[in-house]
């Protein structure tokens, strides 16, 4: 089964908790604090595996949770860092945030990695808070929560050649006779409902990867038919092979077919207009094909390549393969992905998901309580041990330093009012 788009949820590992401990040894009076830090939580890492061709594995498992870092120990021993959770994806995978729709990673090369959900840092043990004024602090920090987000994985096939055209023009038949691929072939429209890849070898021992894409129809760039679902696979092909039924056996005009498909490619992504294209006039064994071909060529520029073939009789197939291989050699040094990234407004390779740090918002619940939310304050809340009075006092100082107390006063919060953070309730005290 071919799967090229899936939504999954990721949870990076929380950092291990720091601990509160003291040095207790014979002949060492006033040994002082000795609580170790927690280990770093595991990150969720995506890695390209060139042996994969589909996102099928993610269809059956859609929730991924990385391991937590170990807690700190006494004698200033730090907890062990958790091992990253590595998820293998095929080349050409784009990772997008569901919430913001921004591109987090674009992975194209074998072994390429991207950290999409970063593990939390370990909480600090009490020895890290020792100061001359407080040489024996009796509080420590919980581990930082790991990042949690939903992402969409999209696969854009990395094929050298993409076969495009209306349904039933012979794309799957061509792929089946020039490679060992076995696409489904039938005498009805949309027999191909998923892309098929095949490795093609020419008689002079040159090879390339060809993708048979499902048939396009007018309006495909707007999602009509299979639309956007498979048009994106054309984006990374180096050469477009545009197949046309020159016999007009479906009752359509070959020239109209050519113009409609080209317009759909242009409408979908403007840069495809300049992508190298070879026109294949198929079904030349049928009546009216020669006359239609002559009229077709008269309407095109002289520099447009048109190769007449018959996938049934296999006439001129080798000549077509030579033409494709020659065109690929002409553009072998052109990186079409760079052009793609410029249009997307991002740089290829990898991106880091970084929530905004110090911003917070204040709202009111129906019962009149004030609700404070924001990445930084929620992270500090989770890292605070509320069973420790010194840790609670430190949390209150952090809220004041962030300006939350002043912001609450500006919103009308007064002595004794309830303030909520992530379900925890506090009483505002002047």
Curated annotation (Swiss-Prot):
GO biological processes: ribosome biogenesis
Its Gene Ontology molecular function terms? GTP binding; GTPase activity; magnesium ion binding
Limits of the OCT domain:
352-430
Which amino acids does the record list as binding GTP? 165-172, 190-194, 212-215, 282-285, 310-312
Q: Where is the OBG-type G domain?
A: 159-329
The compartments listed are:
Cytoplasm
Enzyme Commission number, as recorded: 3.6.5.-
What are the UniProt keywords, alphabetically? Cytoplasm, GTP-binding, Hydrolase, Magnesium, Metal-binding, Nucleotide-binding
Q: Could you say which residues bind Mg(2+) here?
A: 172, 192
**Protein family (similarity comment):** Belongs to the TRAFAC class OBG-HflX-like GTPase superfamily. OBG GTPase family.
Relate the assembly described in the record. Monomer.
What task does this protein carry out? Answer: An essential GTPase which binds GTP, GDP and possibly (p)ppGpp with moderate affinity, with high nucleotide exchange rates and a fairly low GTP hydrolysis rate. Plays a role in control of the cell cycle, stress response, ribosome biogenesis and in those bacteria that undergo differentiation, in morphogenesis control.
| Name of this protein | GTPase Obg
Species the sequence originates in: Staphylococcus epidermidis (strain ATCC 35984 / DSM 28319 / BCRC 17069 / CCUG 31568 / BM 3577 / RP62A)
Taxonomically, what lineage is the organism? Bacteria, Bacillati, Bacillota, Bacilli, Bacillales
């Amino acid at each position: 089964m071919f799967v090229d788009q899936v939504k999954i949820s990721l949870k990076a590992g929380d950092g291990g908790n720091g601990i509160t401990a003291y040095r207790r040894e014979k002949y060492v009076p006033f040994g002082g604090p000795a609580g170790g830090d927690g280990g770093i939580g595991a990150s969720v890492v995506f890695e390209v595996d060139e042996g994969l061709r589909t996102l099928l594995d993610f269809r059956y498992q859609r929730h991924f949770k990385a391991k937590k870092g170990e807690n700190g120990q006494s004698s200033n021993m730090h907890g062990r860092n958790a091992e990253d959770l590595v998820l293998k994806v095929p080349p050409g995978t784009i990772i997008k945030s569901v919430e913001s729709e921004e591109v987090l990673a674009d992975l194209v090369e074998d072994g390429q990695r991207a950290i999409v959900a970063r593990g939390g840092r370990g909480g600090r043990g009490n020895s890290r808070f020792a100061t001359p004024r407080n040489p024996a602090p009796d509080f420590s920090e919980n581990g930082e929560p790991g990042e949690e987000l939903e992402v969409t994985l999209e696969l854009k096939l990395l094929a050298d050649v993409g076969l495009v055209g209306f349904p039933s023009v012979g794309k799957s038949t061509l792929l089946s006779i020039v490679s060992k691929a076995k696409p489904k072939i039938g005498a009805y429209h949309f027999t191909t409902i998923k892309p098929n890849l095949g490795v093609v070898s020419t008689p002079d021992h040159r090879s390339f990867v060809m993708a048979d894409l499902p048939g396009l129809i007018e309006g495909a760039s707007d999602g009509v038919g299979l639309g956007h679902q498979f048009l994106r696979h054309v984006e990374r092909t180096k050469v477009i092979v545009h197949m046309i039924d020159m016999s007009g056996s479906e009752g359509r005009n070959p020239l109209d077919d050519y113009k409609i498909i080209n317009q759909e490619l242009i409408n979908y992504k403007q840069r495809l207009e300049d992508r190298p294209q070879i026109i294949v006039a198929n079904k030349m064994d049928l009546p009216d094909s020669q006359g239609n071909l002559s009229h077709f060529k008269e309407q095109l520029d002289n520099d447009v390549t048109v190769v007449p073939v018959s996938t049934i009789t296999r006439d001129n197939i080798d000549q077509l393969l030579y033409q494709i291989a020659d065109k690929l050699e002409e553009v072998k040094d052109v990186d079409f992905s760079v052009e793609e990234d410029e249009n997307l407004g991002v740089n290829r390779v990898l991106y880091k998901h970084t929530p905004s740090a110090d911003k917070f918002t204040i709202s009111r619940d129906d019962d009149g309580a004030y609700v404070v939310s924001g990445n930084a304050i929620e992270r500090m809340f989770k890292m605070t041990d509320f069973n420790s009075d010194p840790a609670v006092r430190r949390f209150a100082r952090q809220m004041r330093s962030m300006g939350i107390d002043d912001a609450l006063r500006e919103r009308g919060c007064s002595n004794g009012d309830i303030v909520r953070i992530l379900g925890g309730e506090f009483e505002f005290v002047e």
